[in-house]
Curated annotation (Swiss-Prot):
The lineage of its organism: Bacteria, Pseudomonadati, Pseudomonadota, Gammaproteobacteria, Enterobacterales. InterPro entries: MFS (IPR011701), MFS_dom (IPR020846), MFS_trans_sf (IPR036259), MFS_Transporter (IPR051788), Sugar_transporter_CS (IPR005829). This is Inner membrane transport protein YdiM. Residues 27-43, 106-132, 179-206, 268-273, 318-336, 386-404 are cytoplasmic. The chain crosses the membrane at residues 6-26, 44-64, 85-105, 133-153, 158-178, 207-227, 247-267, 274-294, 297-317, 337-357, 365-385. The gene is ydiM. GO terms for molecular function: transmembrane transporter activity. One of its GO terms (cellular component) is plasma membrane.
Amino acid sequence: MKNPYFPTALGLYFNYLVHGMGVLLMSLNMASLETLWQTNAAGVSIVISSLGIGRLSVLLFAGLLSDRFGRRPFIMLGMCCYMAFFFGILQTNNIIIAYVFGFLAGMANSFLDAGTYPSLMEAFPRSPGTANILIKAFVSSGQFLLPLIISLLVWAELWFGWSFMIAAGIMFINALFLYRCTFPPHPGRRLPVIKKTTSSTEHRCSIIDLASYTLYGYISMATFYLVSQWLAQYGQFVAGMSYTMSIKLLSIYTVGSLLCVFITAPLIRNTVRPTTLLMLYTFISFIALFTVCLHPTFYVVIIFAFVIGFTSAGGVVQIGLTLMAERFPYAKGKATGIYYSAGSIATFTIPLITAHLSQRSIADIMWFDTAIAAIGFLLALFIGLRSRKKTRHHSLKENVAPGG
């Protein structure tokens, strides 16, 4: 039987195609925005950090309210905020007003997350991990298309702002489509069911688990967000690539992330434990970053762009969220809010740190990301070991119960 929420899911996914473009719009148009705002690269980086603050300011609040009042209002609000950002950012001529519009874009991201992730888990209860990972496919598609769009605009000597207008146009059409779609019922007003008490207790999240998943939300977001913002500049100024070639690194990066999504989604659904992939991908990210820092040559950077896209931006953040949401079966919006609040702290703090590092050396930025990835691997290892320990405990408990 066809899932009645498939059209809704498709619309939700298209929002993240636009979001993928929105994340990179300012960094890929950095030179033009420096002129528009009368600032330098560090100034643009500070404006980029406003997305993280805006996201953090409302994410937990929006997640809690989406559990209570439903997902649709927050998704529509997020789309409206994003369109305001796309139009408004081009109308300002200083970084203060630009910072306000960046803050609005961060809020838009939070509203979308608070409504979309729980909606997909409720629309596809048998495969929530796959449903969430596919979000990353659309984010990566947007990040793949944007460098091509900007390269075309540069080649045709057209206004850089058309890249913002294209994103706004897609979002507007999708808003009209989603307005007519049906959303799955949310659990906010359901009465508690006594027979679910045992299951709820089994899924209760300990303080240690809560802290580890929340910290992983920060680390995983920081690892790939830093690369997505500075990969082009690293290729140009450290590896000695041309501007047009350095921009294409982001397309290579997104090809890697797309391939990872299409490989990971069936693996999680059928054979491999999510925690295994969490540990594996985080470890490979660390090795890739360490290698490119030691050997920042033309071909190494190209290979690095593909590998780091595969391992850090191919759905590992969504895997972490799905694992955490399993600990909050009746409060998925709350889990999303907590997890992505940590991630939004990363999108706020990382640009501030890298703005300082960029004034010294762009190479230092990748060394900094290498250290983050190393911590991420240790954390993923901790999560994986605790998860397997709990799985063995529950299996033993089930085997002993019939004989009790």
